[in-house]
C-alpha cells in the first residue's frame, strides 16, 4: 500500500496534508482498496464547522457505504467537486486528484494526535482489515 511520507493519518484511514493553517483531506490508498470501486461521494458543505473525529461525508462503493471523519477540527473551505462527476478519482489517485475536502485548522495541537506514516503502516499491516471508518 502507498503511504506517502509527507502526510499524517487518522486511525479511521483519512490522510491530512498540511499547508500552513489549512489542510487537504482524503482517504488512504488502503481505505480505497478495501472499499473497491467508488461510485458516489457525498461531499461536505463549504463553511461547515467540524470537530476532530466527527463524521463529515460519505463515500459509497460497489461494496459498501463508508462514513468519512474529519481528522482535525476546523471549517470546511473547499470540497472536490470533480468527485461528483468522477468519484473513481478516489481509487485512481487517492492522494492527488482524489482529495475530498480542505479545512481551515482550528486546533493545531490536534495534529500531534495523528499518526505518522510509520505508525499508519503498522496499523494497516497488523490489523488484517480496514478497521473503523471503512
Describe the residue ranges of each PLM region:
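Aromatic- and Lys/Arg-enriched surface recognition patch
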Residues: 77-101
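A short, compositionally biased micro-patch
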Residues: 18, 61-62, 71, 106
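Short, charged/polar surface micro-motifs in flexible loops or helix N-caps
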Residues: 32-33, 46, 73-76, 81-83
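Short, Lys/Arg- and Gly-enriched loop/turn segments at beta-strand edges
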Residues: 60-69, 86-88
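Acidic, low-complexity mobile loops and tails
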Residues: 1-55, 92, 96-134
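Short, glycine/small-residue-enriched coil/turn segments at secondary-structure junctions
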Residues: 2-4, 68, 72
Amino acid at each position: 500500500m502507498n503511504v506517502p511520507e509527507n502526510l499524517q493519518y487518522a486511525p479511521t484511514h483519512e490522510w491530512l496534508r498540511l499547508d500552513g493553517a489549512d489542510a487537504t483531506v482524503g482517504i488512504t490508498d488502503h481505505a480505497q482498496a478495501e472499499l473497491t470501486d467508488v461510485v458516489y461521494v457525498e461531499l461536505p458543505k463549504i463553511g461547515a464547522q467540524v470537530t476532530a473525529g466527527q463524521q463529515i461525508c460519505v463515500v459509497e462503493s460497489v461494496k459498501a457505504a463508508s462514513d468519512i471523519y474529519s481528522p482535525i477540527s476546523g471549517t470546511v473551505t473547499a470540497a472536490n467537486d470533480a468527485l461528483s462527476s468522477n468519484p473513481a478519482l478516489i481509487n485512481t489517485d487517492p492522494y492527488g486528484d482524489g482529495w475530498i475536502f480542505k479545512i481551515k485548522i482550528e486546533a493545531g495541537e490536534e495534529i500531534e494526535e495523528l499518526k505518522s506514516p510509520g505508525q499508519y503502516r503498522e496499523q494497516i499491516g497488523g490489523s488484517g482489515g480496514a478497521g473503523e471508518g471503512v
